[in-house]
A protein has these predicted regions:
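Histone-fold recognition with a strong bias for associated Lys/Arg-rich disordered tails
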Residues: 1-138
Length: 138
């Protein structure tokens, strides 16, 4: 039996920063925006997002349907869910460590349409991000 993958430095930084940023989000979409702003700065996730032109600020107006308060619940649960899915992504790659790209894949899975909307506002989409990461379509 092989050891469970552990976060590399970039993934640990992303998860740590998210743990301090998420409590200030008013909705799941705002949480997704915070994840994106963090992920674009670290590791393979950052390289993929920046190569797609994802910048600090959104290309489109961000206002609108943030669903304030709806779903911005227990940050510990969402961090645990993202961490668990990231570990599975790393295991799927046969990697000994969880990379920032695995965290990005996990955020895409856990946040679903909320993260898809955030990606669109930044001028990209799930398929482009996963392709840039070298992950099968999801």
């Amino acid at each position: 039996m092989s050891a469970r993958p552990t976060p590399d430095v970039d993934a640990a930084l992303v998860l740590g920063m998210a743990s301090t940023a998420l409590p200030f989000a008013g909705s799941r979409e705002e949480e997704a925006e915070r994840w994106l702003r963090i992920l674009r700065l670290y590791g393979d996730a950052g390289a993929a997002l920046q190569s797609l032109g994802v910048s600090e600020g959104p290309l489109e107006g961000a206002g609108g349907n943030g669903k304030h308060g709806a779903g911005a619940g227990d940050d510990t649960d969402v961090l645990s869910a993202v961490s668990e899915v990231a570990v599975r992504a790393a295991e799927g790659r046969g990697a000994p460590t969880v990379a920032a790209g695995d965290v990005l894949v996990a955020v895409i899975e856990v946040y679903g349409e909320d993260f898809d909307r955030v990606l669109r506002v930044h001028g990209t989409d799930r398929a482009e991000v996963l392709e840039r990461l070298g992950v099968g379509r999801g």
